Swiss-Prot record:
This is Diaminopimelate epimerase. GO terms for biological process: lysine biosynthetic process via diaminopimelate. Pfam families: DAP_epimerase (PF01678). It comes from Pseudomonas fluorescens. Belongs to the diaminopimelate epimerase family.
């Protein structure tokens, strides 16, 4: 059978989006891995699946597969593309959309200027909730990587993140440390790794090594986690502008127990069909 799909991106973080509300198919990890290959498939960072909800209090269910076939809990840039997609495809007329994810409910707001705001919910900082192995919660942790000590913050935005502060974003060891921290035994579910350079109290630059995808052009949940770490440690103040290789995100966070608000664009690239 042929399935219709849409290729989209949020700041260069690119997605294949499938509507399984009006189409019906059973998507497996092997399909995500096959389609995600940039040489022999369609090529993407993540596959986003739009489904009818299980919960009557939400509008849609949102599933996410990495290009390596692993299903993950959350994707912030994908959430913005999800909102743009369901409106463009007339699956809803709402501009405030509630979506069920593997890690909970998020709220999407499609604004008149085309930007999309996402209420990502409150960050989780208790180590067991991330998950991260540590005896107690702290603002930062020291982790042994190949005999060297790396200081990092650990945050869950529905998916796990490690945040490292660096002096120079251009020389940050993203490809050296990223995969080692991603697979570090203290992160039993693996982890996304952000490298953050603080510019001033409200501006920063960020590169992210994504779990199951490698370095991407942008990572929405990574920007949220970096903002939480920077505000918690007193490096920065809300609101924040975070520049990633693919563009800029606006992040607001009022402090512990409060939701993180992310705002940025979502772009449709092309439509296609793929054989299942």
């Amino acid at each position: 059978m042929l399935l219709r799909f849409t290729k989209m991106h949020g700041l260069g973080n690119d997605f294949m989006v499938l509507d399984l509300v009006s189409q019906h198919a059973h998507i497996l990890p092997k399909h995500a891995k096959q389609w995600g290959d940039r040489h022999t498939g369609i090529g993407f960072d993540q596959l986003l699946i739009v489904e009818a909800p299980n919960n009557p209090d939400v509008d849609f269910r949102y599933r996410i597969f990495n290009a390596d076939g692993s299903e993950v809990e959350q994707c912030g840039n994908g959430a913005r593309c999800f909102a743009r997609f369901v409106l463009d495809k007339r699956l809803t007329a709402k501009r405030q959309i509630r979506v069920e994810t593997k890690s909970g409910i998020i709220e999407l707001d499609v604004r008149s200027d085309g930007q999309i705001g996402v209420n990502m919910g409150a960050p989780r900082l208790v180590p067991a909730d991330i998950p991260f192995q540590a005896p107690a919660q702290a603002l930062s942790y020291q982790v042994d990587v190949d005999g060297a000590t790396v200081e990092l913050a650990a945050v869950s935005m529905g998916n796990p993140h490690a945040v490292l502060r660096v002096a120079d974003i251009n020389s940050a060891p993203v490809h050296e440390l990223g995969p080692k921290i991603e697979h570090h035994p203290r992160f039993p579910a693996r982890v996304n790794v952000g490298f953050l350079q603080v510019i001033d109290r409200h501006r920063a630059q960020l590169r992210v090594w994504e779990r199951g995808a490698g370095e991407t052009q942008a990572c929405g949940t990574g920007a949220c986690a970096a903002a939480v770490a920077a505000i918690s440690q007193g490096w920065m103040d809300s609101p924040l502008l975070i520049d990633l290789p693919g563009g800029r995100l606006s992040i607001e966070w009022a402090g512990p127990g409060q939701p993180v608000m992310m705002t940025g664009p979502a772009v449709r690239v092309y439509e296609g069909q793929v054989r299942l």
